[in-house]
Amino acid sequence: YFNNFKIIKCADIKDKAAKKCASIYGIKSLSVNELLNDNEIEIILNLTIPKAHYEVAKKALLHNKHVYSEKPMAINLNHGKELLKLAKKKKLYIGNAPDTFLGGGNQKSKEILENNSIGKINLGNAIFAFPGIQSYHPNPEPWFAKKEGGPVIDMGPYYLTALVNLLGPAKEVIGSIMK
């Protein structure tokens, strides 16, 4: 529960989707351009598909809005760097998920490591398995598109962020995917 901000409006490139969201949450729906030009809006919560994150975030920054996106910030490194540079130039905040490392389990783990309760850690490992996005997601098709990244971009950042937060930058990474 976040009581320091209030979601008051929503937008989607599909008007029907924006109206559905607005109806569910009792907020006002706008077109994307209306939202970007609305002076009442201070921050954009960007929940688009990954390949659209860069474009939406850039437009929001250019319209003097702070941005918080789902992961990833951008599909390629140069676009990510460009967004960070633009936010800094305009004195705006930009952030993105995953913020799950701020949760209780990861914070307790960090406390244990910082107190040296279990000694030096030399290796981090993360394993994720599930029945597939199609088992629960209402629109799984973009997840399988070439530039969407699939499970690596969808779930990988949660585990990698936790490992980096707990253990520091990686010196070597090994990965595998099985169908």
Question: What are the language-model segments listed below?
Answer:
Residues 1-25:
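N-terminal Rossmann-like dinucleotide-binding module
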Residues 5-9, 42-44, 149-150:
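Short active-site oxyanion
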Residues 20, 34, 43, 55, ...:
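Alpha-helical elements of Rossmann-like donor-binding domains used by nucleotide-donor carbohydrate transfer enzymes
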Residues 26-34:
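Conserved SAM-binding strand-loop segment of SAM-dependent methyltransferases
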Residues 30, 68, 93-95, 125, ...:
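Structural detector of well-ordered beta-strand residues that form the stable sheet scaffold
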Residues 43, 49-50, 54-101, 116:
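Beta-strand-loop-alpha-helix segment that lines the small-molecule cofactor/substrate pocket
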Residues 47-48, 128:
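Glycine-rich, N-terminal phosphate-binding loop of Rossmann-like dinucleotide-binding domains
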Residues 100-179:
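Predominantly a Rossmann-like dinucleotide-binding segment in NAD(P)-dependent oxidoreductases
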